[in-house]
């Protein structure tokens, strides 16, 4: 049973939503805001082209690796304590990134920032699902989903504006006022809540095994794109296969430990018996694979093919942010009436159509005629999907496992995004190389077309998987 400490003062719904959404916005924003600033960062910190990718990879690696631990920590130590811990680590790391003087310093603080994000992000969803109930929950999830989805698009806009008008360092400093505001509100209004039965039990061995295994898996994936002697290492390189082997052995050991040895497992595998949670995470894995790469490829398409600068690239993403917000708000209003599965079917259908449409872009395409509508359609699909996925993944579980369910869902999204970007990046590079060498604008566009075609196929698989999500999800008695 949850144990609740007396709040410092009664908090209106909008303040709790602000506490959760502000922190989630910071975490999601930092995944995309760096992309537009990378060329300037690379020049000032004297990165090589090959090593600059680790500004992104270091964050992704630790963020994905620590998400399950962060989610379970919110259940065990309390959502308020974990939220403030993650927020502090994330904000301090942002300051460090803004002041970084060398490439190695930047990679180190980005890794620390990823750990802070992994602690913080599951806590934000835990705050939502343990505070709001009944008809209030879909509305709260809708706003949280809108913020989570729009952060990717807004990151491109803010990154372009800050890099073009100030300095790339401000893509990190921008987190500081948000972090201070969120921290003050949490200290003043957020009450503590944790699982009394698990209050003093943390499965340290399980945490080490799953964190190390996921980190090895993600490292193996990003290792495929590492360039050595002008060629990517690829999927069949010995180093890549060794990382995958280590991840497989670690996950197998983790499974045995959790099911046979641990008295208080980090991830009680019983939660995967909840079909809504299992299927929602599978859909999220697929959707993450398709959508994470969209931001990446469109950023390069705008700058290298259409010739946009950082600021114009940022504004090109603005309609997508608006579409995500519209989709999320629409989804939150329809969820109590339609339930999750119909919304998932609609969202994945729109995503499939949007990616197919995007796959028709060319060297001489126009943004307003050929890119705006399909990218907005994909963004609308993101908004429609996140709310029912969050609802399906958390409604059927005990409130004592809310943080864990949040961590699992975030892990699925991040793991899908990392795998999707690596696979689609490899396919795009292969298509470009087959088209022409040295690479031309037409060759690069050919690679982007291939990536969007495969993304449409992934979205179609997600559509089929959505049929397995229960039509009506019964809430757990202790939810």
Language-model-detected regions and their locations in the chain:
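Interfacial helix-cap and linker-helix signal at transmembrane-aqueous boundaries
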Residues: 41-42, 73-74, 158-166, 221, ...
